[in-house]
Regions:
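Single conserved hydrophobic/aromatic residue that forms the stacking wall/gate
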Residues: 1-6, 11
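A generic structural motif
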Residues: 5-7, 70-80, 199-209
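Glycine- and acidic
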Residues: 8, 40-45, 172-175
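Glycine-rich, highly charged phosphate/nucleotide-binding loops
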Residues: 14-31
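Gly/Ser/Thr-rich loops at beta-strand to alpha-helix junctions
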Residues: 15-16, 45-57, 175-184, 207
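Conserved alpha/beta core surface patches that mediate binding of polyanionic ligands
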Residues: 21-26, 56, 149-155
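N-terminal glycine-rich phosphate/adenylate-binding segment common to multiple enzyme folds
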Residues: 27-89
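A charged, amphipathic alpha-helical module
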Residues: 88-263
């Protein structure tokens, strides 16, 4: 349904991820669940060469076309392409957002590494739902208790009953970032792989941000960018590693779960 809505609202040559993004947002707006006069949308804007740069424009066009021109769209970018009145983000906001991403990455690791081997069908998903609610409460409290939360999550998944004598083929999932991570965009590929007898392996979303920071080193060495930009990129990598240190620490202590590696 989201794809259909997106295709109706976007121009004909829009890429598949943009159809999904616009379709999801418009589906939510027209669902009746929200007061459209007290609603705002936020979307990242990269400024790069691909159509991800046009997402904000696509969304605004779709809103106007559907009769909701009053709904503001906040363009979130590191470069500061737009000034968004009424929206202020600071380091506390960024830290909380990155902690949320770290928890999401952790959930992918603990669920995908255990669910194919669970002794009691549905036990891993039940455990996931339990800790998902706990994670939401943690984020609503500004990330307080983040370190204890991730250690408790790993400990609980370390003790879920598994068929330890079975080893399934591991299949890595790669591709465009939205399609890779969003189940409704990739036809629930993880579940399909598990149904076919495989263990799905998904890269961390935080690793994508690290790759973006690491790019500054390449641009400095080969494309004429400044040494300062490379240094700032390395500082960004160090900041992300420090932020997800509790996750890495908890996974290193695990008897069955694998931690992420440094870029």
């Amino acid at each position: 349904h989201e794809r259909l809505v997106g295709s109706e609202m976007c121009i004909r040559d829009s890429c598949y991820p943009s159809l999904i993004v616009v379709g999801q947002m418009m589906h939510a707006i027209t669902s009746g669940k929200y007061d459209i006069n007290k609603l705002a949308l936020i979307m990242t804007q990269t400024g790069g060469g691909c159509r991800a740069t046009n997402y904000v424009g696509f969304i605004r066009r779709a809103l106007a076309k559907a009769g909701y021109p009053q709904i503001p769209v906040i363009a979130l970018s590191v470069q500061g392409f737009e000034n968004n009145s009424g929206f202020v983000w600071n380091m506390k906001t960024v830290k909380c957002a990155m902690q949320a991403l770290a928890i999401g990455d952790l959930f992918m690791r603990v669920v995908y590494q255990t669910r194919p081997y669970e002794k009691v069908k549905g036990s891993v998903n039940k455990l996931h739902r339990k800790w998902e609610h706990a994670a939401i409460r943690c984020m609503e409290n500004g990330g307080r208790g983040f370190s204890k939360l991730v250690h408790d999550i790993v400990k609980d998944f370390d003790n879920v009953p598994l068929n330890e004598n079975i080893k399934k083929p591991r299949v890595g999932i790669v591709g465009e970032i939205l399609v890779k991570f969003l189940p409704s965009a990739n036809n629930h590929l993880v579940e399909l792989l598990e149904a076919e007898g495989a263990e799905a392996v998904m890269p961390d979303l935080l690793d994508f941000f690290q790759y973006c920071f690491y790019n500054n080193n390449y641009k400095y060495e080969y494309l004429g960018k400044t040494k300062k930009s490379a240094r700032n990129g390395n500082l960004g990598i160090a900041a992300l590693e420090a932020l997800r240190h509790p996750v890495v620490s908890a996974l290193k202590k695990s008897k069955r779960l694998h931690p992420p590696v440094h870029i």
